[in-house]
Amino acid sequence: MDNAVDRHVFYISDGTAITAEVLGHAVMSQFPVTISSITLPFVENESRARAVKDQIDAIYHQTGVRPLVFYSIVLPEIRAIILQSEGFCQDIVQALVAPLQQEMKLDPTPIAHRTHGLNPNNLNKYDARIAAIDYTLAHDDGISLRNLDQAQVILLGVSRCGKTPTSLYLAMQFGIRAANYPFIADDMDNLVLPASLKPLQHKLFGLTIDPERLAAIREERRENSRYASLRQCRMEVAEVEALYRKNQIPWINSTNYSVEEIATKILDIMGLSRRMY
């Protein structure tokens, strides 16, 4: 067996496999193991299911260790094929549905693609999500200052502190219209809140980052440049944090947080409603 991998983990679904991945990752994060992940969406027919079973079995025979299989599959005939594999199979949805069925005294009506599929009865939410993504892309990195009043949150920060990925995650995951505005080196001699942002101060949220981490990120982009120097990064971070404090702008240090954690903290601090899709 590959010494760098403790377990092979499959995430299998007749839909996008997002639910299987999210719940499976949450479970596996509780164990001190290194995993090799294999995600297999849209396992919708018996031929595809048999190919997946063969893939699971091949890894078992190669390694001698049962792969872990997290699955979410509606059709019983497809499930049956996966369960015949040499993997240790866990139906992540049924594990929650069964006790709820007993508690609510209702029978579930499972439908493939229901969790992350496009529901004809839910097109307004889908359209709102796409509009949020379009808005966020159009207002990335200060590209456009038009219609900033339509933003639900405006992220501020120095270059490469995480504004763009956080904005896009907010838009794609929660349908939040998130603009972001960069403070660049040329701003630092007299750093003030831009006039275009002052009327929208209630929508502003700042990001900062440890200078050492910022320098490492910038070095990958512009090696041996003033832009990536630790001295420059320390100066920019200090100036921006002083601006946040002076203008009472809420802010967090993004250094030790994932994009998901940063976005969730922003939603909580800014009082924005979460919309799941």
Swiss-Prot record:
One of its GO terms (cellular component) is cytosol. ADP binds at G157, V158, S159, R160, C161, G162, K163, T164. It comes from the Bacteria. It is an enzyme of class 2 (transferase). It holds the Pfam family Kinase-PPPase. Its EC number is 2.7.11.33, 2.7.4.28. Coiled coil: none annotated. Keywords: Kinase, Nucleotide-binding, Serine/threonine-protein kinase, Transferase. It catalyses: [pyruvate, water dikinase] + ADP = [pyruvate, water dikinase]-phosphate + AMP + H(+); [pyruvate, water dikinase]-phosphate + phosphate + H(+) = [pyruvate, water dikinase] + diphosphate. InterPro entries: Kinase-pyrophosphorylase, PSRP. GO terms for molecular function: ADP binding; ATP binding; enzyme regulator activity; phosphotransferase activity, phosphate group as acceptor; protein serine/threonine kinase activity. Belongs to the pyruvate, phosphate/water dikinase regulatory protein family. PSRP subfamily. Bifunctional serine/threonine kinase and phosphorylase involved in the regulation of the phosphoenolpyruvate synthase (PEPS) by catalyzing its phosphorylation/dephosphorylation. Homotetramer. This is Phosphoenolpyruvate synthase regulatory protein. It comes from Escherichia coli (strain K12).
